[in-house]
């Protein structure tokens, strides 16, 4: 009996365990989210994907005080779907997808909605993370993503300052990738 128990224990220890395949996908208009996303991907050994708009955002596009700026127009229309210039060839290989973005108007930018709707994310764990100077969390963004990807496991995620340390990112992300 002891020999069997030792054999089972050794088999379990020596058997390779499948680690979740991770992706950090992000949109960054000014570079703040890019910095956090790059640190996150490096700290958890994840693939990195830039959600790049077909038409890059200019400073005028990002002027939230102008109702006619591109970002204001997109964010005032919930059905707006800015076109993405980049594509993930095989999203099925990923188990956990961290989706990063700046908070615009208290939620995710419309290009994130384009990204979410572009793929079958059924069975994936989607973890939003964001940068923002004022919005305290990603709860509204997570709720929006849940509506767009109802068969995915979308968690509430977290907002980070641009100067967040890699160790903090790893500690936070580890709860979703084990």
Predicted regions and their residues:
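Glycine-rich, phosphate-binding/catalytic loops in enzymes
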Residues: 114-117, 144-146
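Glycine-rich, N-terminal phosphate-binding loop of Rossmann-like dinucleotide-binding domains
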Residues: 101-102
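N-terminal beta1-alpha1-beta2 submodule of the flavodoxin-like/Rossmannoid cofactor-binding fold
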Residues: 10-96, 106-108, 117, 167-178
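Short, conserved loop/helix-junction motifs that constitute active-site signature segments
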Residues: 91, 117-123, 149
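Short, glycine-/small-residue-rich phosphate/pyrophosphate-handling segment
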Residues: 127-161
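Hydrophobic membrane-insertion alpha-helices, especially the h-region
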Residues: 1-10
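Short, structured coil segments at secondary-structure junctions
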Residues: 43-44, 122, 148-153
